[in-house]
Amino acid sequence: MKITLFSSKPYWVKWFNELNKFSYEINYVTSACDIKSVNEAKGSEAVCCFVNDDLSKEVIETLHSNGTKVILMRCAGFNKVDLDTANKLGIPVLRVPAYSPNAVSEYALSLIMALNRKTHKAHDRVRDANFEINGMEGFNMVSKVYGIVGTGNIGEQLCRVLKLGFGAKVIAYDIIENKAVTDIGIEYVKTLDEIWKQCDVISLHTPLNSQTKYMVNSESIEKMRDGVMIINVSRGALVNASDAIVGLKSGKISSLGMDVYENETDYFYQDHNGSIIKDDNLSLLISYPNVMITSHQAWYTKEAISCICGTSLQNFVDFRSNQIKKSNLVNNPISSQPTQ
């Protein structure tokens, strides 16, 4: 059976080849999945796509016409997938729901600590033989109040490290409380406004939907403490970049760490060295000394990529044997039958 894997990189080839104990034929395509490249999957029973691949109505209809029966997302997010079209055409969309909450929560912590102690700037200085520490002042981690927005697996892990590891005060917000979080003495607040008003460091760990889009905007920033640090390792559009820039310029936001960006599709996972960044907000944010932007790599650990590749292959096995795990299925296809 054939799988076409879009947005292929050497690390995907390495791990899928190592874990493909089922001897599936895998067609590796370096291009992202979109209307221009979709015909590369012609004759493939499955396509395996990544977070920024474009699975629009037109793309999914073309996949269906070309014989694709199932979409395997090798990530947790699926906001670029037209689920309505997949449902109508009977195409299941399977994902990897929890490949490594530790990897992402640890990365969020690394952004907090780097922005606090300015280790990235210190490293650059020393490389230039500048051993001055002027402007490198930070704060003791225990001295600040941390607000965790979203306490699923990732948010819970960050709560644990901040509370139990550093002994810091942590408050949380989520529409559903996580008992594991309250069991370690962390209090939930009833509204986001309480997070905005009470916290020195705010870390976002929520999915992107109509309620969460631009949750960090001019109105919410105005309610925050002066000098707030904001961390986003979830979805780029949780933060309105234009409003964040205004907050950074005014000093309301002291530092911003983002592993995601709303318009990242045109840039992340690609080498644009020597090119002009045409996204004005992204170009401006990259230039700020108190902003750290990385290219959606919080998930990227050996353990996580092994889990992602293994689960993606197992999802195809489960589809072919009519034993799809409900926890991995993100849509409600009318009908779906594997090729016999």
Swiss-Prot record:
GO CC term, one of those recorded: phagocytic vesicle
Pfam families associated with the record: 2-Hacid_dh, 2-Hacid_dh_C
PROSITE patterns named among the record's database cross-references: D_2_HYDROXYACID_DH_2, D_2_HYDROXYACID_DH_3
Active site (UniProt): R235, E264, H296 (proton donor)
GO MF term set: D-lactate dehydrogenase activity; NAD binding
Record keywords, A-Z: NAD, Oxidoreductase
Transmembrane segments: none
InterPro entries: D-isomer_2_OHA_DH_cat_dom, D-isomer_DH_CS, D-isomer_DH_NAD-bd, NAD(P)-bd_dom_sf
Name of the top EC class for this enzyme: oxidoreductase
EC annotation from Swiss-Prot or TrEMBL: 1.1.1.28
Catalytic activity, reaction form: (R)-lactate + NAD(+) = pyruvate + NADH + H(+)
Binding annotation for NAD(+): N153, I154, D174, T206, P207, V233, S234, R235, D259
Family the entry assigns: Belongs to the D-isomer specific 2-hydroxyacid dehydrogenase family.
Protein name as catalogued: Putative D-lactate dehydrogenase
Species: Dictyostelium discoideum
